[in-house]
A protein has these predicted regions:
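Conserved acidic, metal-coordinating active-site core of Asp-based
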Residues: 18, 31, 36-39, 152-155, ...
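Short hydrophobic/aromatic-enriched beta-strand-loop microsegments
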Residues: 114-120, 134-135, 176-178, 280-285, ...
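Active-site phosphate-binding/coordination module
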Residues: 72, 76-173
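Short, well-ordered alpha-helix to beta-strand connector turns
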Residues: 57-58, 89-90, 114, 197-198, ...
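Non-catalytic pre-domain segments flanking phosphatase-related domains
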Residues: 5, 9-63
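Short, structured coil segments at secondary-structure junctions
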Residues: 110-113, 121, 222, 276-277, ...
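Mg2+-dependent phosphoryl-transfer enzymes with acidic/Ser/Thr/Gly-rich catalytic loops
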Residues: 18-21, 25, 29, 51-56, ...
Length: 318
């Protein structure tokens, strides 16, 4: 990717990405008063330039369904419209969601379940031609971290791709928290599908700084980070780089279908993942949310260029 290409992708990222013919982000932002008429026209020009540089056939478009699949497995109309604006063969579902069955339902709803390759999440690749492949394989990798937690007397459970393993005594509160946690992840029958989650879940109350430090250290020991997911628990999960790796594997598996010139996502949290991959990128819903990352937004003098972004990602700032 040349500097010019990078600048083009970055600028296009600021303008949002959308397929020609749809109600694109520049128009939406103008309608909402976020950009001026001049800025809107510039955004549309950048969109045309982007697709002139990175032809549609060279793009890997993916839908991140993390915050779209509800407990009832309902896909938002907005994402349906956006996703359906692309050729069927150019669609891949990429998600770190935990409910595989619900995500599979979404894949069917989007018509990609029979595609050559569909990434259900950062840990599992689903190939319509041959079933699943576990990519992250966190189970064994989590062993050193689990040992640290056990030696320090912290309760945890370890999710393998095929089982939930309770390896430390759980108090009544921990057990209740586990049940409450698992209620979030229901399959199509309304049953908790906790056997298909690839992560280490540690039970630590928010504000218990000593225990929090232990969990952080345990995660760091295996090169991962601990994520606070609830007031009572931490997750140690594969990092965004693993999700990006799954995206690369997906593109490679697709072979002649994609040359991975660029990737187009639909969520702000796709940004660091794509940056980790070292790919030209664009996302669909960037707007004032960019201010959180120090990016330029309409009417703002703040700016962050691509090299600084990649530096932030490499240092784990994003």
């Amino acid at each position: 990717m040349t500097d010019g290409d990078g600048e083009l992708v970055y600028e296009y990222f600021l303008a949002h990405v959308t397929h020609e013919g749809l109600d694109g982000a520049p128009e939406i932002m103008r309608r909402d008063g976020a950009v001026s008429d001049v800025e809107c026209e510039r955004g549309k020009k950048l969109r045309r330039e982007f697709f002139a540089r990175f032809k549609t056939r060279d793009l890997l478009y993916f839908a991140d369904v993390d915050n779209t699949v509800t407990r009832r497995g309902i896909l938002s109309d907005e994402k349906k419209r956006f996703f359906n604006g692309w050729a069927l063969s150019d669609r891949v579902v990429l998600s770190t969601g935990k409910i595989y069955k619900s995500i599979e339902k979404t894949a069917r709803e989007l018509g990609v379940d029979k595609n050559p390759c569909c990434c259900l999440n950062g840990a599992v690749l689903y190939d319509g031609r041959g079933g699943r492949e576990i990519v992250a394989k966190l189970g064994e990798k989590a062993r050193p971290a689990a040992r640290i937690l056990r030696e320090k007397g912290l309760p945890y459970v370890l999710y393998y791709p095929d089982a939930l393993r309770v390896e430390t005594p759980l108090g009544q509160k921990d057990y209740e928290n586990l049940l409450r946690y698992d209620e979030m992840y229901l399959d199509e029958k309304g049953e908790t599908d906790f056997k298909r989650v690839v992560k280490l879940l540690a039970f630590v109350d928010e504000g218990d700084s000593e225990s929090e430090a232990i969990v952080d250290g345990a995660a760091a020991a295996i090169g991962l980070k601990a994520l606070r997911t609830a007031p009572h628990s931490y997750e140690i999960v594969p990092p965004l780089a693993d999700k990006g790796r799954a995206l690369k594997i997906t593109a490679k598996r697709l072979g002649v279908h994609f040359r991975m010139t660029a990737a187009v996502g639909d969520s702000m949290n796709d940004l660091p993942m794509l940056a980790v991959c070292g790919l030209p990128y664009a996302v669909s819903d960037a707007s004032c949310e960019l201010a959180r990352f120090g990016f330029a937004v309409a009417g703002s003098d703040r700016n962050t260029d691509l090299p600084e972004l990649f530096d932030k990602v490499s240092r784990g700032v994003l």
